[in-house]
């Protein structure tokens, strides 16, 4: 009597993609009974061991192993999905691959590179502009500070004069105290005394 083989659902054990002249993707499934492999491109099944202009599928089965490779000779459309599906009566296992155009990745890289260069150049221009304007900014600030200082000095001197005048007006004159005057002032005082008498 032969021992019963244990049934094993299809399971993806290995997958890879490489890009040289063409894009090649491979899937390896294991299961008992041996899984069948089906490729799907953009939701449409691709024939096994067949050629479809831009697609070529090659599959091999050995014992519980099923290996399949798909080759794309033309560049895929942006965002196209490639699906590798292995199934047997006990289960299904699949791998979805999102295909990107080589041109689109280069365009994105060029955009990012340009964006970084633009940011660096903008930083340099701003720094140079600041360095050129720095003397004008300093001159403007010093002018403002000088005006403020002059206004404060003028305010202080007017307060000092006002307080001195206030002190002089409040100070009583002492009778009989000699008044010291210059020669010209004393002549004016003498003339005033003569007129008064």
From Swiss-Prot:
Membrane keyword on record = yes
The GO cellular component terms are:
membrane
Presence of keyword Iron: no
Predominant cellular place of this UniProt entry's protein = membrane
Q: Which UniProt keywords apply?
A: Membrane, Transmembrane, Transmembrane helix
- Membrane-topology descriptor: Single-pass membrane protein
Q: Where are the transmembrane segments?
A: 118-138
Which Gene3D superfamilies is this protein grouped with? Answer: Immunoglobulins (2.60.40.10)
Q: Spell out the subcellular localization from the entry.
A: Membrane
Residue numbers spanned by region Disordered: 160-179
Compositional bias (Basic and acidic residues): 162-176
**Superkingdom:** Eukaryota
Spell out the PANTHER family in the cross-references: SIALIC ACID BINDING IMMUNOGLOBULIN-LIKE LECTIN, SIALIC ACID-BINDING IG-LIKE LECTIN 5
This chain's protein is named: SIGLEC family-like protein 1
Q: Which organism is it from?
A: Homo sapiens (Human)
Q: What is the lineage of its organism?
A: Eukaryota, Metazoa, Chordata, Craniata, Vertebrata
> Source gene?
SIGLECL1
